[in-house]
A protein has these predicted regions:
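Low-complexity, small/polar and acidic-rich linker and loop segments
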Residues: 116-122
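Acidic, low-complexity intrinsically disordered tails
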Residues: 112-115, 404
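Core catalytic lobe of class I
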Residues: 2-111, 124-368, 410
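PRPP-dependent phosphoribosyltransferase catalytic core
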Residues: 367-412
């Protein structure tokens, strides 16, 4: 992510009327500077005259609250021409001392915020590619979803760009301002929630930073199911931060109870040299289910697809094992799976092999996905290997080495 940029997004301002909630104080400042027809140099000069450096101002890029220091706070309010309360409201906050007034005026606020009924007019969009049970669309996921009826999919899985400044296919922006990224995220989440059936489940895969915003937003409309930590394997350290070791996979249910939950079991982790258990199960060994161990909310057995021979495209792609677990856990055959960010097509490939109907969109290159679906041999082979371990306490290979070295087996 860039430390600085020349301008904020046009979508974030129009005259002095705010078009969205701001999630970064810096984004709000830059937007107001454009309203004043100021250059970036003019903006930085204003704060420099008040002994606030450019670096200090830029530090507000990732901050959704006003600075504590009075001089800094006063400079921000003076530049914006807004009171502290107005800034809080622009950031989407309702200060504690004003919450009673807010609740006392809910009906009036609701009238002011009444949405147009024309937001989701169904439109006909031609699929890029179809199978006997699936449809792939090439285009912006929000526009694609506007053509999907309410409450018609059983599972939504989304792996959006993480906004880390990576290069993807033309048209995909992975370097948005904080405010634009979160507002865009909320926009496609609204559509995902709309098309999800009651009792259906939504999974969002992202870095923890963004999932804190996503979880808070989904929690206002859906029922929390789980926050799963997916071990990211071999990540690089970040200066002055804890070592990043997981991706977040947040899951919510539309309504109170999920329509479908199929328990997933995995094999016991053993030493590949001697066959001994890596984890001590103590006196519970005799009670262990021969079909395997229940999956927890920490998934350490999902490995990233990094080797070129295993990848379908140049960019990152998701593991077949990850999608198999999510789809099998949350759906049954003939249920409908939707993925707004198709990527390399892993969701669609797995759904096709598992006999789930599917709908998907991808803004970038869809030809890669089409060829993957037309040639499923590699994915089928991966799925076959996964099922050798799935729902078995020990694989056939681990049974051999454990038997050889005198370790217990569930059937003996």
């Amino acid at each position: 992510m860039k430390a600085d940029y020349e301008s904020t997004d046009d979508e974030l301002h129009e005259g002095t009327r705010l078009l969205c909630v701001f999630f970064s104080v810096y984004d709000l400042i830059v937007s107001r500077s454009k309203d004043k027809n100021m250059t970036n140099d003019d903006m930085f000069s204003f704060f420099s005259a008040r002994k606030i450096s450019k670096a200090t101002l830029i530090s507000l890029q990732q901050t959704s609250f006003l600075p504590d220091k009075p001089a800094f706070k006063n400079a921000v309010t003076d530049f914006l021409g807004m009171s502290e309360l107005e800034i809080e409201l622009a950031m989407g906050h309702i200060p504690a001392e004003y919450r009673k007034s807010y609740y006392d005026n809910i009906s009036h606020i609701a009238m002011l915020l009444q949405k147009s009924t024309d937001d989701n007019v169904l439109r006909e969009i031609k699929p890029f590619f179809e199978t006997d049970i699936g449809k792939l669309y090439n285009g912006d996921c929000i526009e694609i979803m506007k053509g999907i009826p309410n409450s018609c999919v059983d599972l939504v899985f989304a792996d959006p760009p993480f906004n880390l400044g990576k290069t993807y296919d033309p048209g995909i922006d992975d370097n948005m301002t904080m405010s634009k990224y979160i507002n865009w995220t909320y926009e496609w989440l609204d559509q995902c929630i709309r098309i999800l059936k009651p009792g259906g489940r939504i999974f969002i895969y992202n870095i923890p930073k963004w999932c804190t915003y996503i979880a808070a937003y989904l929690g206002e409309q859906l029922t929390f199911w789980d926050w799963i930590a997916v071990d990211m394997k071999f990540s690089l350290p970040i200066q002055n931060r804890l070592y990043p070791a997981h991706y977040a996979l947040v899951s919510y249910i539309k309504g109170v109870k999920a329509t479908t939950f199929n328990n997933q079991r995995i094999s016991m982790q053993i030493c590949r040299h001697c066959g001994g258990e890596i984890k001590d199960y103590g006196g519970y060994k005799s009670k262990m289910n021969p079909n395997g161990i229940n999956v927890s909310d920490v998934w350490s057995d999902i490995y990233p697809v990094r080797h070129k021979s295993s990848k379908n495209r140049e960019y990152n792609e998701l593991s077949v094992k990850l999608l198999d677990r999510i789809i099998c856990m949350s759906t049954n055959e003939s249920d409908v799976v939707f993925d707004p960010f198709g990527g390399s097509g892993t969701t669609f490939a797995v759904a096709q092999l598992l006999k789930r109907r599917w709908i998907g969109s991808e803004l970038g290159n869809c030809e890669i996905i089409k060829q993957r679906l037309l040639n499923p041999e590699k994915d089928k082979a991966q799925l076959d290997r996964i099922y050798q371990e799935k729902n078995h306490l020990f694989t056939e290979e681990s049974k051999k080495i454990r038997r050889k070295n005198g370790f217990w087996l569930s059937e003996e």
